[in-house]
């Protein structure tokens, strides 16, 4: 998979991609590709940061100090999309129209509200186009 430059896309990255990059022992090939994706400035949401942190504590056995550094890094290097009333109400509409789960609808709504054109996720339908503007991509599938 080729990773486009930030000038060519505004990408939102789901927590599963971050976790492959941050917990390298899971799958070395996926970890390498995920690391390339997150090396570029990306869009994340508060929900993604929370999911990454809880998994780093549980599975990655990271210390609270390391978690604090992860949080700082997210906020200093990437655009953090808020989880506010507008995003939550858009998620309701997405559940109605696209049949996303509750948590997935919040991810998609945050990506849309932040102006993302690509959503990297292993958990959603590859190549799905949402609202004619957001393409869901599973970067681990062969093109």
Show the residue positions of the predicted features.
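Short, well-structured N-terminal submotif of metal-dependent ribonuclease cores
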Residues: 1-44, 59-69, 143
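Acidic, PIN/NYN-like endoribonuclease modules and their adjacent C-terminal/linker elements
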Residues: 1-6, 108-143
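Conserved glycosyltransferase catalytic-site signature
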Residues: 15, 85, 104-105
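Glycine-rich anion/phosphate-binding loops
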Residues: 100
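Active-site-proximal, substrate-binding regions of enzyme catalytic domains
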Residues: 51-79
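Acidic catalytic patch
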Residues: 47-50, 72, 77-97
